[in-house]
Amino acid sequence: MFLALNYSPQAVRLVQSGQIKIDFFKTPDWDWLIRQATAIHPVAVHFTLEAGNGSISQIDWKQVDRLSQLTGTPYINVHLDPRQHHYPEISVDTQSDADVKRVYRVMLTDVMQLVDHFGAEKIIVENSPYRGEPGNTLRLCVEPEIITRLIEETGCGFLLDISHAIISSRYIDMDTYEYFSRLPTHTIREMHFAGIHRLNGQWIDHLSILKADWRWLDWVFMRIHMGEWSQPWLLAFEYGGIGTAFEWRCAPGVIVKQVPMLYQRVCDLNSRLSAV
């Protein structure tokens, strides 16, 4: 398993100065940024594709394939993220069988378009965070049974965003251990992780790692070590980034302190797994 870190100017300076060690920068699928990042360090591209809103058919298939091959990223990810503003006539927290059936059909169709182009073995489906926000992510797409069903029916792999799973479990009022136990963790191909803070009455991720977050990561690593969950190719620390949405959460002090702690955990897990 490798370690990636969100690309940011602060992260670049720390990598170039030798203050932190990572295996990959994680970047969005922006051509200019990938060119900039690959000149400095290996890159794992994270695609901005979404399933559930009927937009997959509009993507540039050649561009997706080109960026995947250019960076050597082994998987093409898609976010399972139908949003209420695409379905204004249903409530964001709907659990109606008719609504679930309707939206699931769109999610399945979107993912299968990717499967038809690239093959199921190449596609990984990421779980989104649900917070019950009007216009935003629908609750039904974070239900573990829905995620599991989609993975099984499409044959795709699972991109487990640990922080998203924790946040979603809190907002749907399900015990977090129970939530994880219902996810298709035997199909994990990649994982994402970041700190979760309570800000303005909401649980927000992509922040510095707190004590409670470390405990969750260690618990996840134990599941992998015990062979209960499959081993991902990559763990991405989703701290920092490009633009105004991230400029307030790119503290060099956080990166220089927490990345080595993550890297050591990844190395320790790799050593334990290779000794089995």
Task: Enumerate the predicted regions with their spans.
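N-terminal pre-domain/capping segments
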Residues: 1-68
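Hydrophobic faces of well-ordered beta-strands that scaffold small-molecule active sites
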Residues: 1-7, 20-27, 41-47, 74-78, ...
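Active-site-proximal loop/turn and secondary-structure-junction residues that shape catalytic pockets
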Residues: 9, 29-31, 49-51, 80-84, ...
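Flexible, charged surface loops at secondary-structure boundaries
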Residues: 16-21, 36-39, 69-70, 116-118, ...
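Gly/Pro-rich active-site loop or hairpin
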Residues: 54-55, 93-104, 168-232, 240-241, ...
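Active-site acidic/histidine proton-transfer and metal-coordination neighborhood
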Residues: 58-157, 167, 254
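A short secondary-structure junction signal
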Residues: 134-137, 162-163, 169-172, 203
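C-terminal helical cap(s) of enzyme catalytic domains, especially alpha/beta-barrels
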Residues: 246-276
